């Protein structure tokens, strides 16, 4: 994308990868977006976000909004985020290792139709991810043989919490069609009903 963008500005949401696994500015992006609520905070107790840019003009405008509009984190959220970043590398290594194990396990289950995780060699983005990332992250999607099966998986898990967030130390599962993407109904962004999203935590697997 960076090679063919022309005069367009490229902004990459790097929330799933974090700066530990991928650095979009070094790959040609103009700006990078992070939800610090997720992996950077890492403990499901922060609300925040960050924009990183190499563009001095954009940086100046962002500083203006921060100073005049108040687009800054609360002191306590800033403290929690700084605390979380101290363990980012250790946590991300564990997220990646656990996700790889879970993806490979699920891929061998007859109940599962498809596992979408870039750490699997049959994933269409595996080669690219291996080239530009230092790990494959902790997020995956799993497709089952029916929408009802997917819903029942979400409603009957005993070790994984049913919740919309991601990037915390605990594993979370959700049904995007009826949760995170419910507002996308009627658009091209509607996920398949048989799809489940899992945020793999740092538990002992």
Annotate the PLM regions.
Residues 57-60, 162-177:
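Mobile, glycine-enriched helix-loop/loop "lid" segments at the mouths of ligand-binding/catalytic clefts
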